[in-house]
């Protein structure tokens, strides 16, 4: 029984295997049929595409051939037309050449006729000249010279008459225009008249204050005069102290310092130094403000800070009794008006006029007119001013040659401002120049820190560097300065030379 079961199972397996093999072969046959069908279809598609491509190519070639044939026909037609036009042009040119040849022949014939006529005229002219020479007794060249000389003489005479007349008219017109411009300019400005004095007075609450100003053994007044460089004159004038100083800045410094000390009531050397320091700062602020104010009033832009400060210092300066800053401002206004009348650049002229006396605002420059122009020009050049402005500053006293019309206008404006009645006083300026010269002589020696000409120029008080100048050198320095003053200056009486050498040692107890 088991054998039969196993035999049945085995037979089943074999039968299944055979069925599977048979089915597999059937599948392979179907697959081969499909592949054969696909191959045939692909070949048919490829053949169709090949035929289509060939047909398209033939069609495209046919189109291109037809297009080329049309282009060739068009080109041939163009060439034929061009040949026709060229033939027409050749025919036209031939006709023109023929016409020109005929015209040239006529011209040549006319030229020959003219040459024959000209020859005949020359022969007649030569015959006439010979007859005239025989009649007048002059050759042709002699007659030509006589005629030329006569015409030349008459031309020169007429030209000279015209030139003289033109010069006279131009001179009259120039004088009239110049007068009109100057009158118009001077009528359009309004100037302030100001005079500077070398003395100032400070009112005191009572005469006892004079003793406090002098101090014990005169230490307070010595400290004031040493720090400020001005004469403090205490005399019998009731309730007043007189300050004498040729330098307006130092005079103002002394006046304000004394007023503040009198108001405060504390007067001793330490307090004096403190007040002098504070007042110096105030005056420096005033200098800056005045410089900025005049620049703003004149609408001038781009000035260097050093130039603005120099203008501010001119507020305290005077020349021949005329305030230098007011003079510079007045000159700038006049120069601007003149520049507009003369069709020049008014901005450049106004700038140069304002800065023309800037050299007087430098501490190391003398107040005389010689030297400050060149020094001011050098300062303006170092501050970046233009060459026209620099030359106008340097040339306003003719120390150098003016190189532009603007420089001439600056000279004219300066002269107008300085020459108006009451503008200047010669005596005051000479006095200031003499005191300045005293200080300049002292500053020329090594070791001099500060120098003040006081007592109306009868004394020079000099503060020296205690490191560079010892006691022995102080004696020699005073003698050398006195000898140089004797050699270079003319003055009545005597001038006292005082050397001050001070050593300060400061230490703090903590």
From Swiss-Prot:
What is the annotated localization of this protein?
A: Cell membrane
Q: What is its main location?
A: membrane
Query: Which residue ranges does the record assign to the KH domain?
Result: 198-258
Bilayer topology: Single-pass membrane protein
What the entry lists under Pfam families is as follows: HD, KH_1, RNase_Y_N
Q: Which residues form the HD domain?
A: 324-419
| InterPro entries in the record | HD/PDEase_dom, HD_domain, HDIG_dom, KH_dom, KH_dom_type_1, KH_dom_type_1_sf, Ribonuclease_Y, RNase_Y_N
Output the CDD domains linked to this UniProt entry.
HDc, KH-I_RNaseY
Name of this chain's protein = Ribonuclease Y
| Biological source species | Borrelia garinii subsp. bavariensis (strain ATCC BAA-2496 / DSM 23469 / PBi) (Borreliella bavariensis)
